[in-house]
């Protein structure tokens, strides 16, 4: 008779979870940050709020964002005036948009990832879907399974309302699934659409205005599995270690509430300080076992919640400016796409590493870190090992 320990041993993969493919997608509607204040105040019938518009213009100018992509076009917003008001009951209109668009955009990214992976979609064993944009039953995971034509017995995991740290969360979960289920191939999808958070400006709630200056739409998809098939699957990054922690004394620093007016976010001004204060401890826990204490010797992927967070982390750790190059590039070209951001940065980094003729997918370096920051204040940490190009 076979023992439980023998069964468990046979169920486990031998090697670490590995990212085998990455795909990304954005809505067709591209919004230039330089002209966005004019559009935003016009479409929300707020052009009379001259001082507030000037404040918003300064926010956009300081955001380090050049452009964003948004599902919400002028035509859609004109058809849904309640979405343009500040805190007007509008949840039905928002939900009707995102329950369709979130899985659709996710499919676009997933198709690209599956194509790069090069294996038939019938080999996908697990699906992790993550979004902070809208809620429905059956969920976006079910809708994506139908859209892609995946097998009905794919094991699905649906993560709603996690926020900006969740790009790290999906990697942590995918790692555990791949390493504990021999032969598993996990499709990971993060899809975010700002139709749930868009609203007009308010003189009394400037933190809402910050979100209007930063958030953009995007979806990213990965294929994750252990023990890649030689000559068939091409590893991009290995995931070696993960952690999640709640920063001390950070309650209320970032929170979101889904109500009749849609999803509202509240940010305290000291969010960058809280992140930078706690990042050193997270790094020590992650890299001390590897004998690494020079954080300029590793590659960096950090959720770009905004330029102030990146600036303070750089300052706290005395990081060289080039360490955050891939992160800042994604912020500049796409804005803050919540959970999808860090996956876009993974893609950006491996592409630039190949283009620049570097030795590894991690900017020529062996080890790296991926950080997610979000409501809680929650910090996700993933230790990555690059792959020789």
Swiss-Prot record:
Similarity annotation: Belongs to the thiolase-like superfamily. Chalcone/stilbene synthases family.
Keywords attached to this entry: Acyltransferase, Flavonoid biosynthesis, Transferase
GO biological process, one term: polyketide biosynthetic process
PANTHER family attached to this UniProt entry: CHALCONE SYNTHASE 7, HYDROXYMETHYLGLUTARYL-COA SYNTHASE
Organism: Pisum sativum (Garden pea)
UniProt pathway annotation: Secondary metabolite biosynthesis; flavonoid biosynthesis
Name the UniProt record assigns to this protein: Chalcone synthase 4
Gene name of the encoded protein: CHS4
Residues annotated as catalytic: 164
GO molecular function terms attached to this record: naringenin-chalcone synthase activity
EC number: 2.3.1.74
Protein task: The primary product of this enzyme is 4,2',4',6'-tetrahydroxychalcone (also termed naringenin-chalcone or chalcone) which can under specific conditions spontaneously isomerize into naringenin.
PROSITE patterns in the cross-refs: CHALCONE_SYNTH
Record-linked Pfam families: Chal_sti_synt_C, Chal_sti_synt_N
UniProt entry tagged with the keyword Lyase: no
Broad EC category: transferase
